[in-house]
């Protein structure tokens, strides 16, 4: 339910309407702390403001805890994160979700950010637009919606959010290219949509072999100026990249099984619906 916690208190000691506690024993015990330390009081008030729903907050914190931070995809620096509406599209498993969570982790004002997945059970009986309304009322500034195509009528509600909340920054991702393309047509005047591919060879070398190779223009490559620095014989690495280097999870245990799952879900869920 909608519960906002004070530092060091449990949900049972908080008014279940989501407001500050009534004049109860718990609240009276809290008053000396407010008088003693205004800084702590300010921190508590901030916690009150940013927490919309316990299950969504806990889900976001768990996802952020699992997010690796040592490597960023090439697209990370190109995304205008402060634009009003941004979409990131691409195949399953290439790192879209990781990239937006990395941005949240790297932002000092992440207390006003909310990360949700459109297939979360919360949306079984809640509307996306209602969540945005409440989030803005609670002081939220950045809403990140993962796998947005899992939410029916997502493009219409994103248009509504865009038109109603001009100060809210929304970033959404989608893996179902067909669904995203259909919805993006409705959002063409509003959303900046960035396609994301799998790892490039340069990214593969940096992620798995710690080789940071510079980029070269086509003219430089044709002029023979481009070379893979840090590796004396790059061809074996390139063959390895062609075999399994497209996905960031290729170095994990069970890569083949997970790759098969990605292919199956793409065929059975994304393509079959069309």
Where are the regions a protein language model picked out?
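Interdomain hinge/linker elements that couple catalytic modules in large macromolecular machines
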Residues: 35-36, 42-61, 206-274
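Pre-Walker A adenine-sensing motif
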Residues: 63-81
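Hydrophobic anchor at the beta1->P-loop junction of P-loop NTPases
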Residues: 88
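Conserved lysine of the Walker
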Residues: 96-97
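Short glycine-rich substrate-engagement loop in P-loop NTPases that contacts/grips substrate
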Residues: 111-139
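Structural recognition of the conserved hydrophobic beta-strand(s) that form the central parallel beta-sheet
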Residues: 169-175
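Short regulatory helix/loop adjacent to the ATP-binding pocket of P-loop NTPases
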Residues: 178-193, 208-209
